[in-house]
Amino acid sequence: MDKDYFTMRAYLYNVTSDSDVPFKLNDLANIWFCTSKNAKRKLHHYQAKGVLQYQPGLGRGNLSHIAFKEPLEKEVLLVLKKSLAEDSFSDILFLLQLPIPKNWFSNISTEIQQMFGLQLTENQQEVLRSIIRRKLTTLDPLQTSVSMESFILTQISDSLVKYDEIDKKVVSHIAHHWHVTEDYKEWTFYLRKSILFHHGRILDSEDVKFTLLRAMQPNTVPFWQLQDIKNIHCTNKFTVTITLNNADPFFIRYLCSPNLAILPRDVTFDEFKLIASGPFKMVERNDECLILEAFDTYFLKRPILDRVEFWTAENHHTLKTIPMQFTSVDYEENSAYVERRKTGVGVNFICFNGHKNGVAQHKAFREAMYHLLDAQITSQELFENYGTIASNYYPEKSIIPTKHPEKIATLLKKANYQGEKVIFGTTQHPTALQESKWICDRAAKFGIHLEEKLVSHDDASYSSVTEDDLDLMMMGEIPAADGELAYLDFLNNPNLLPQHLFSPEVIKEISTKSNEFKLEKDASKRDALQTKMDNWLTKNFHLIYLHHPEKSQSLHSMIRGVTENPFGYFDLSKVWIETLPTKTAKSNYK
């Protein structure tokens, strides 16, 4: 399929639905990301194929014209039917995302739906094919700070040990046992002897050392967790000892993170050909899809699903009728799917910029924003499934805070706020845009001029926003299974928003309080220290918690074995299908 041709047709259809269309050559060059000269060549090529007549504009300022041979709807449906017959998912998703009328697809919507969700191939392979609404960022374990990417890493890689969320303790994984000295400075791990990487080599202690040394480089996500490592010694092929400069009872908890997934030392790292040792192996990754297959020689139980496919589709409005395994669907049109909701998945918050000169530096202004940001009112006026009101990082510790909007005027006067523009950052997620607009409108009622600044998902997740760009930012955080480590990471991870926006003075205080927290061996005392640290941040209004979101996923009714993954998704390695799907998909793999 010629995607450039249909990109042009959809673009011009939104100018006019007539078959004869006036246009500027430069506009086509822009949508094709080419020069005007190359755009003209393309048009002559299409004219030679007989699909259009091209009439260049004569004289400066005169528009060119195209006369199409066939209506766009007819051409789209012809190509779509061909793509369905060939199981060409890439072409189908491309057509569905074009800015063209949705009702064109109504007669074949059932066939389109059946291509996604659960599939059975001709050679009895069970496939879960799903759609994600954005391109993946990075799958480099040392760089990812996003829940979806971290979830995928747990499916294709393994950490040295794991954290059991139910029993609240570290359990064996790659390491079957470990020993730590009384001073918590020397940690020895004993590795299983038959773990294979995806490329066939046995995992050994040198791979553990290689992974940790790579992670100890500056500018990695886990760098802050490993700064105390003094030495890594491979005693033998399956024993490794890590010596620390200072006592750290928390050290083993870091090793549970997917950011410290053990990678092979003999393969140059390539996140598009990622080799690890997890239950699934990566067989294809590009901007359109990520395809995983079960790793037959996985050292634990082999996944029952044979293949998992993630297809990227960023135009969610056109795709509401297609099963989105990890988000919501139109349940009226997808009766085989059921909704699965979970409350308290992470926390949404606002963080103030401690680097930029301006009114946000004034505690009184931040307090005024605290009283203005009433999540109870937001929930009542805006969201049906807003989740629960937040006053702490943890849902179980949150209470409904008391807000006093009558104090706002006095606080603004104390901050000497004169109605100047305050830059308010938000991501481009639809619910974030909805909430940020509500916040801006509410602020205006109190005389606060918030100017919304849209920040891309990548920039927001990896702190790529420059410190001069905004005064405050709204963001969400989805923690891993280990709640204590998640909180430490939230405040200390250099890729996350707090470390990027907090002033050096606040960061220094966080570091001191975090160290005190890590050295405390008693869980109840650590809990009290967390509350104390969180209260210090919120009472000084360095950050304001909004709500703990409610997460919705669509699950096919035939899926069984669903267990919660730390990042709010279900563990693909444990999923199985009770009744085989009625549709047989073509097999394009062995």
Model-derived features with residue positions:
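Ligand-site clamp/hinge motif
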Residues: 297-335, 344
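Extracytoplasmic/peripheral linker and loop segments enriched in polar/acidic and small residues
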Residues: 490-555
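Periplasmic binding protein-like
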Residues: 448-492
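N-terminal lobe/hinge region of extracytoplasmic solute-binding protein
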Residues: 131-180, 588
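Append "and occasionally in soluble cytosolic enzymes with long acidic Gly/Pro-rich linkers
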Residues: 361-441
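Surface-exposed binding/hinge segments that line
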Residues: 223-265, 284
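Long beta-strand-rich cores associated with HINT superfamily self-processing modules
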Residues: 555-590
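Aromatic- and charge-enriched surface segment that lines or borders ligand/interaction sites
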Residues: 18-20, 42, 145-147, 177-219
